[in-house]
Amino acid sequence: MAELATIARPYAEALFRVAEGGDIAAWSTLVQELAQVARLPEVLSVASSPKVTRTQVAELLLAAVKSPLGAGAEAKNFVQMLVDNHRIALLPEIAEQFEALKNEREGAADAEIVSAFPLNGADLESLVSGLERKFKRKLKPTVAVDSSLIGGVRVTVGDEVLDTSVRARLASMQAALTA
């Protein structure tokens, strides 16, 4: 997947430069919506059909998004360029990299929190507050539940992983005892 990331990076950076001249949040919404549409196998099938023109594919993509930016000339040019270069399948990766650029500009990061049990509002706020102090930046959490952790949480922020789960502690103890 590193190849996809390498190919998608210039598109994401160019789109981000365009977005800096306007509303970054609105562009983020547009690119996320386009990525969702591009994930649909039906759309990729239509896009690769020789019976459908490139202009029709671009119009289909833009018609499928709700964002008001979809009607703008810059958005149309971006989508048309992706269609012309056969890069529609890159939209999810472009969206991911666009979000990373947006987070970097805001001094924030996405945090994936996996807990053994569901976290209520107060527990989640307390956990996120502590994690923000540890990672020294604002975090945008996404929470999932995985009962196989037995207890505790596993937090992933960028390429850093903080695993305080019981399963990780048991694995660590097992490694220490068998070494």
Swiss-Prot record:
Keyword Methyltransferase: no
Gene3D superfamilies reported in the protein's UniProt record: N-terminal domain of the delta subunit of the F1F0-ATP synthase
PANTHER family in the cross-refs: ATP SYNTHASE DELTA CHAIN
Subunit description: F-type ATPases have 2 components, F(1) - the catalytic core - and F(0) - the membrane proton channel. F(1) has five subunits: alpha(3), beta(3), gamma(1), delta(1), epsilon(1). F(0) has three main subunits: a(1), b(2) and c(10-14). The alpha and beta chains form an alternating ring which encloses part of the gamma chain. F(1) is attached to F(0) by a central stalk formed by the gamma and epsilon chains, while a peripheral stalk is formed by the delta and b chains.
Family: Belongs to the ATPase delta chain family.
Role description: F(1)F(0) ATP synthase produces ATP from ADP in the presence of a proton or sodium gradient. F-type ATPases consist of two structural domains, F(1) containing the extramembraneous catalytic core and F(0) containing the membrane proton channel, linked together by a central stalk and a peripheral stalk. During catalysis, ATP synthesis in the catalytic domain of F(1) is coupled via a rotary mechanism of the central stalk subunits to proton translocation. This protein is part of the stalk that links CF(0) to CF(1). It either transmits conformational changes from CF(0) to CF(1) or is implicated in proton conduction.
Protein name: ATP synthase subunit delta
Gene: atpH
